[in-house]
Amino acid sequence: MDLAGLLLDEEGTFSLTGFQDFTFLPGHQKLSARIRRRLYYGWDWETDCTLEELSSPVADIAVELLQKAAPSPIRRLQKKYVAHVSREACISPCAMMLALVYIERLRHRNPDYLQHVSSSDLFLISMMVASKYLYDEGEEEEVFNDEWGAAGGVAVPTLNALERGFLSAMDWRLYTDPREIFEVLSWLEGCVAEQQGRRRGWYTYTDLCVLLEQPAWQLVLGSLCQQLAKLSCLLAMAYVSSVALAVASMAVIHQSLGLSCSPPPGPPDLGLASRCLLEPCIPSPMPQCLPSPANASGCLEGNVVLRSLWGSLLVSLTPPPLPPPDPPAPPILLHNCPLCQKLQKDSPTCRACHHLNHTVPTGPPSPWSHSHGLAPPWPWSPMPPLLPQPQQCSLFSIMELARLKSFIFPG
């Protein structure tokens, strides 16, 4: 709010016709409402809540400021004295703010004057000069020196001497730019809001609005907002990182569980094959027709396979490839033995009948007769041999197989 806003009306013009009819200048009511609301003057226009004396918070600020400006212990300023003078001399808030401007000038231009004057005299003379500057002769607010002396308890000659000394220290420069008045008003509003908020322990909405307009508070709140924004960003990054870590952990655990549930690579179960190989051949009646040479040699080869089975289990799982098989042997003439019903060659009389503890194999030696260096009959071997089909076995072969089983599995 500037001086032009106070002098111009709502249409932006100011007419001199009928000037005496104006009770208030344009914008004066807004300024009065601002002072009443922010300087704790009250809102009751009809009772004692007027602008003709200082409010209690403003009086406290004035006492504190003048005691610091004039540290002389003689006639030290008290709040009771400020309230009495402001009530008797009708000190307005604008006169109070103008007096504060004068005291601030003295602090920079003539600090020696403030060291020799008491705080009570400084308050009285600064308020009197500010009132005379604002209210010209002939106005209703005009107060003469004798009235000021009676209000402050000072004789008129002493008051006149104090006035001359004050004007000399000010170098008779009493003009003040309206912007300085509003700067002092803003500073005074901030001091009152901060002091009253600390005294009560809480701040009103008006106090918060006043404090947010102060440059120092704006800087503090700005830095606080920056710190809160940084903290929010850090918390957001930490949250996103934790969520990503949790998702990655769940993926790894799921993958590991999937791999553990899958069957591991390895050799197949040989229980069924071993049981099939260890089972003895069940004798069956001899077919009427003559069997082929391959079927006849199957029963003889079963014993050799059973003996070489346990040795082949100890061989490495990855043996070298099998050598190429031998060429097939020429067919051999076989004869049926009438005594043991067993096929023999060369002679119709079976030598197994005379030698019960020996079994003579027929045909060429089987490649399974040697367990060392041969691949086990497993599906993943390079050239797995075909397992012989169970055929009819002789009585002697069955006896030898039972004897072998009792030797391997005693009891």
UniProtKB/Swiss-Prot annotation:
Spans traversing the lipid bilayer: 231-253
One GO molecular-function entry: cyclin-dependent protein serine/threonine kinase regulator activity
Membrane-topology descriptor: Single-pass membrane protein
Presence of the UniProt keyword Secreted in the record: no
Subcellular location: Membrane
Source organism, top-level taxon: Eukaryota
Pfam families with a match to the protein in the record: Cyclin
Keyword line: Membrane, Transmembrane, Transmembrane helix
InterPro entries: Cyclin_PHO80-like (IPR013922)
GO cellular component terms listed in the entry, alphabetical order: cyclin-dependent protein kinase holoenzyme complex; membrane; nucleus
PANTHER family: PROTEIN CNPPD1 (PTHR15615:SF108), PTHR15615
Protein family per UniProt: Belongs to the CNPPD1 family.
Protein known as: Protein CNPPD1
Originating species: Bos taurus
